[in-house]
Regions:
Chain A
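Active-site cofactor/cluster-binding pocket
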Residues: 1-176
Length: 176, 386
């Protein structure tokens, strides 16, 4: 079987949970099914709240050796609309937390802030956008995502984050 | 066995938990901090029955580890970068005292300029400290070496401290698939530590003594031979590891596509995997590319290097350090090993990843392309500011 690899870059600000989302998605894929591999890592360095940060997830049907940063992502996920450069991505699809329809090729908007505010009570959109991503990637259905949430989030946060993830996943899946 | 998705630091902490050290003494430093945090949590939660000793510095961390090992128990410590350099005075004490301490080092840049990111300048500067030095490629190997290192270090023919190096951030902070063994499996592989090299009221011995000009060489020779003996201990330990855990390791080095390779990258640590990916890609185009991964820098695998590179036409040693005024430490050692071995390859040195600089697929591809011209220089990747 030829290797299938999907590479994701997460764009967020310190405190928005970009790396947590990168880990949830990696764990969901790696632990959800046999023969699946993932790698998740942040843009390394000191953590500063509010500063732009990136995180990376690689998913594959073969073991992953390349630990370098993702330069040609299949998906770019923007947790913070202010970080989106408002142009079509050079590679892959951009998934943007925004209520605005940008009308750009390869850009999909989803109002994650609204959904997070209404269901979580805070505008933290990392798990919402993980659910949005899940609707595009085989192996990241809500059942797999729940494995990722269990692996990466403390018990008190799991239920509501899983609920918001499933909601985002199903809303996106309907639109596709 | 439990499937997990954890970082290199977390994987290593799991391996140490399973190895049951009686004492953990450590001082936190980025990017090592998480392994120590996890172990302290395990001790607090009762998952690990160990004395976790908060010390005030790395010098004290190693001094404490030496004291505990001299009391006859299994010990663990961990450090990185400036911390390793601060404990440098104590490293030969541990080695000369023949205390089989296991230490994880998170490979990191050395100041100045101040930099918390990964490279191999710290550990490779301590190559002559008397410690076995191992460089892990991924989190699974790191975890497995947390367990295997004690078997090798504590073997009575070896009795030498063991440093397991994990590339800072690229390995310590990257989350990936790991199989965590069961305690029963590890207990059947790794017996409790027993030694006569200890403070014992029933059989008192002189420890930590002076040896003047007449006898000093005998102790140093014995230390040298003990370290060399590890080369004979590693293969049977890996065979037994394979029988119990089902994972096969390749001894002092790991060769990838070397049988007929003409262009070879020699490297160490987690960038090795990327080099293997690139070699695989080049093979599709008929380029005879290969990779030699140095797993152990000490004891140095000179015989393995000689036989692996015998038919190579051009070799690049890729490493994340420089010995200022000369070349990379690994390059010098590889060249030295090849002298008189019959290898007629051209050999160059590429110093990359300093201060955490990303090493990409294209960087490695460019090295292989360059090898067609049989370069012999020492060069830096990223050396021309762009």
């Amino acid at each position: 079987m030829t290797e299938k690899r999907i590479e994701i870059v997460w764009h967020g600000r310190g405190g928005q949970g970009a790396f947590t989302a990168a880990r949830i998605v990696g764990a969901a894929y790696a632990l959800g099914k046999e023969g699946r591999y993932a790698m998740s890592f942040p843009s390394f360095g000191p953590e500063r709240r509010g500063a732009p940060v990136r995180a990376f997830t690689k998913l594959s049907t073969a073991p992953i050796n390349d630990r370098s940063q993702v330069s040609h992502p299949d998906f770019s996920v923007y947790l913070d609309e202010g970080l989106f450069p408002r142009r079509s991505p050079a590679s892959g699809i951009a998934l943007v937390n925004s209520k605005e329809d940008f009308g750009l090729d390869g850009v999909v908007s989803f109002d994650a802030s609204r959904l997070a505010q209404s269901m979580l009570g805070v505008p933290i959109t990392n798990t919402v956008m993980a659910g949005v991503l899940g609707s595009f990637v085989e192996g990241l259905d809500p059942q797999a995502l729940s494995v990722g949430v269990d692996a990466c989030m403390p018990p008190r946060l799991r239920q509501k984050n899983l609920a918001v993830m499933e909601k985002a996943y199903s809303e996106m899946a309907v639109g596709q | 066995m439990t499937k997990a998705f954890v970082s290199g630091n977390e994987a290593f902490a799991q391996g140490i938990r399973l190895a049951r050290p009686a004492v953990v003494s450590a001082y936190p430093i980025t990017p090592q901090t998480v392994v120590v945090e996890r172990l302290s949590e395990m001790v607090a939660d009762g998952e690990l029955d160990s004395n976790f000793i908060h010390v005030e510095s790395e010098h004290s961390a190693m001094s404490c580890a030496i004291g505990a090992s001299a009391a006859g128990v299994r010990v663990f410590t961990a450090t990185s970068s400036q911390g390793l350099l601060y404990m440098a005075e104590c490293l030969p004490y541990a080695a000369g005292g023949r205390f089989p301490i296991v230490m994880m080092n998170a490979d990191r840049s050395v100041a100045l300029p101040w930099n918390i990111y990964g490279d191999q300048s710290d550990s490779l500067s301590q190559i002559s400290s008397g410690w076995i030095q191992f460089y892990a490629m991924n989190a699974q190997e790191a975890l497995d070496m947390a367990i295997m290192s004690y078997r090798i270090a504590e073997d009575h023919r070896v009795s030498t401290p063991f440093m397991v190096n994990l590339d800072g951030f690229n390995l310590t902070h990257t989350y990936e698939n790991v199989d965590v063994p069961d305690q029963e499996q590890v207990d059947s592989f790794l017996p409790p530590y027993s030694t006569t090299n200890k403070i014992d009221l029933e059989k008192p011995v002189n420890m930590g003594f002076t040896a003047g000009p007449a006898y000093n060489v005998l102790f140093k020779m014995s230390e040298h031979m003990g370290m060399l003996n590890a080369r004979d201990v590693v293969p049977p330990v890996e065979d037994e590891f394979m029988r119990i855990f089902g994972r096969r390791y390749s001894g002092m080095v790991e060769g990838h596509l070397l049988e007929d390779a003409e262009l070879v990258i020699v490297t160490l640590g987690c960038v090795s995997g990327l080099c293997m990916d690139v070699a695989d890609r080049l093979r599709e185009d008929g380029v005879k590319a290969g990779v030699l991964r140095i797993r152990y820098m000490r004891p140095f695998p000179d015989r393995e290097v000689q036989s692996a590179l015998l038919n190579a036409k051009a070799v690049c040693v890729l490493e994340k350090d420089v010995s200022f005024g000369n070349a990379g430490v690994v390059f010098s050692e590889i060249k030295s090993a090849l002298y008189g071995s019959g290898c007629s390859c051209a050999i160059c040195n590429r110093i990359a990843g300093l201060g955490g600089r990303d090493i990409s697929f294209d960087d490695i591809l460019a090295i292989f392309e360059e090898l067609e011209n049989r370069p012999t220089d020492v060069g830096f990747i990223g050396g021309s500011a762009s």
